[in-house]
Amino acid sequence: MATPHHSRRGSMAYYPRVRAKRIQGDIRSWPEIEGQTKVQAFAGYKVGMTHIQMVDYRKNSVTAGQVIMAPVTVVEVPPLTVMSIRYYARGDNGLEVISEEWAENIDKDVLRRINKINRHKKGIEVKDVDDVRLMVHTNPQLVSGVPSKTPEIFEIRIGGSTIENRIKYAKERLGSNISFSDFSKPGNFVDVIAVTKGKGFQGVVKRFGVKLLPRKNRKHRRMIGTLGPWHPDWVRNTVPQAGQVGFHQRTIHNIRIIKFDTKDHVDDINVKGGFLNYGIVRNDYVLLFGSVPGPAKRLIKMRDPARQTRPAVESIEVTYVSRESKQGD
């Protein structure tokens, strides 16, 4: 009998490996924060990647204080519009909506998503409210790289301080726009929630990374050696099989914000010939360290970190941003 020499191929941590329900990621949990009242998430459109040179801010690094090169992802973050406020109370089945408060003027493009707006406002008392969230929508018409005019609608939790301050914060912003600076700043960490690139129906080698069978194997090499033993007489879910690859929702924890700038300085980031499959940036933008899930043009969401292990830094000095063409010339 052959001697086992390798652990199982592929992780069982992400099951079932099926397509995400929606093309935008869903924020399923919110960390508790202390300090000033603020929104705990934001959304933007993935533009592409480039590289920068910056002063190494890590005190214990061998290159501390020196100029190093780093890969970054460019995310265009136009303002989000607050269309309503939702008040939650904790019930037997978790948080339940007890009242909503809508803005007076709603963008006509929002009606592409919502058929009817119920403006009936139910009176509430502060003592009955356990959580306050903003219902916001994106403004894709501001983004030249995204052809859609239909806005995406989602909730953003308001955190920090007391419930009274959160309600006041929400009412001050009802019907107006919020920017990325209301959410976070360079040097802080965020969790990125997005849907990955879709790869379609793929075999076991690409999907799980199983080993190719020997060259003289009958019929095929890119297959598994066996579906399992005679008994139990069913195929177990641990056996690698062909199926969907990609288009899964994933959360990447603790991604550092390297830089944030307004639309007045987009010339500092736009590359020659425009970003591949996107074009040029026209709105506020943010640089995130490393890569994030999804292709260009996809909406990604950024949330306050749920498992921050390293401290934030006050500022990051960026000395150079590559604006060379990404067209492969």
From Swiss-Prot:
Which UniProt keyword terms apply here? Ribonucleoprotein, Ribosomal protein, RNA-binding, rRNA-binding
Matching entries from SUPFAM superfamilies are given as: Translation proteins
Question: Can you name a GO cellular component term?
Answer: cytosolic large ribosomal subunit
Record's InterPro entries? L3_arc_euk, Ribosomal_L3_dom_3_arc_sf, Ribosomal_uL3, Ribosomal_uL3_arc, Transl_B-barrel_sf
Question: What family does the Swiss-Prot or TrEMBL record give for this protein?
Answer: Belongs to the universal ribosomal protein uL3 family.
Q: How does it assemble?
A: Part of the 50S ribosomal subunit. Forms a cluster with proteins L14 and L24e.
Q: What is this protein called?
A: Large ribosomal subunit protein uL3
**Organism, as annotated:** Picrophilus torridus (strain ATCC 700027 / DSM 9790 / JCM 10055 / NBRC 100828 / KAW 2/3)
